[in-house]
Amino acid sequence: MGKNDIYLYGMTLASTMNLLVGGYPEADTYSEIKESYVLPGGETGSCAVVLSSLGCTVKLDGNYQGPKTQKVLDEYLVRKFGIDMSGVYFDETFEGVQDMILIGTNTRTCFGTFGAYFGNDIKRWNKPERKDIESCEVVGLDPFFMDESEQVADYCHELGKKYVTIDCKYDTVIHKYSEVNILSNEFIKGNYPERDIEELFKEYTENTEGLVIFTFGSREIMFGRRNQSIKRMKPYKVKVQSTLGAGDTFKAGAIYGVLKNMSDEKIVQFAAATAATVCSRFPLALYPPDLETINKLINN
């Protein structure tokens, strides 16, 4: 059994990406499409592309694939980036998870069938394999697959493996055991709309030994740990082509930072620079970030 740098558990899908000329259109109007692609996407799919492009060996698992997703994922993730998808289940009765995204000047709007996917009586995602976690250095964990995601957190805790996660509540097992939890502005507004941000941040840090990061798009990043004062950092400024995948690639940068034993400040710097680099180019699977560009952005 080979040893991988990274094990990722979460959502990998086929995305139809339409980059618009200008901003998102008003209803009942016309908008020109500048570029269009069908490429790997999803929180874990995008994360895997970035980590592979940074020189990491990656194995991923999570949702089932089907006839409409397998070809593009095999072409890019497996053959182009060398990502191990050998454990992912192919379900010929299921098309696979897909979405369609319209990308405006500073927006990206996603259309999909995730409500139907997660609301279905049939769970179309794998149970995690303990041996996959045992044979990696660091784990990236999406919290969306219910008991199975929590099982990954339990395995990591039992095996002493550090993991980075995203967008889970402060009273969950996944948050409790995490090395890093990254909370997006979208998640915070959707789940804690009335909460004072600093009080909420403190609640998060009190419920884990790990690093907590709050992101707010182009506004200041908040980060810190239990019994520490809140630290802040301004995101890096770049000429934005597309904000699609910014959160997924921030997570990838944090995973890389944990793998390389970076300090908290360096993890946040590297994650923010990785996300900024991705925002400056499009699409991710054709133009992934590289260490030279990321480090140049940090050092400048």
Sequence positions of predicted segments:
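Structural motif
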Residues: 5-7, 137-138, 180, 211
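Gly/Ala-rich phosphate-binding loop of Rossmann-like dinucleotide-binding domains
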Residues: 52, 157, 259
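Short beta->alpha connector loops
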Residues: 66-67, 143-147, 167-171
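Conserved phosphate/ATP/ADP-binding segment of small-molecule kinases
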Residues: 153-232
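Glycine-rich phosphate/adenosyl-contacting loop at the front of the ribokinase-like
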Residues: 1-61, 71
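Hydrophobic anchor at the start of a short beta-strand
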Residues: 6, 57-58, 85, 163, ...
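Conserved phosphate-binding/catalytic region of the ribokinase-like
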Residues: 2, 197-300
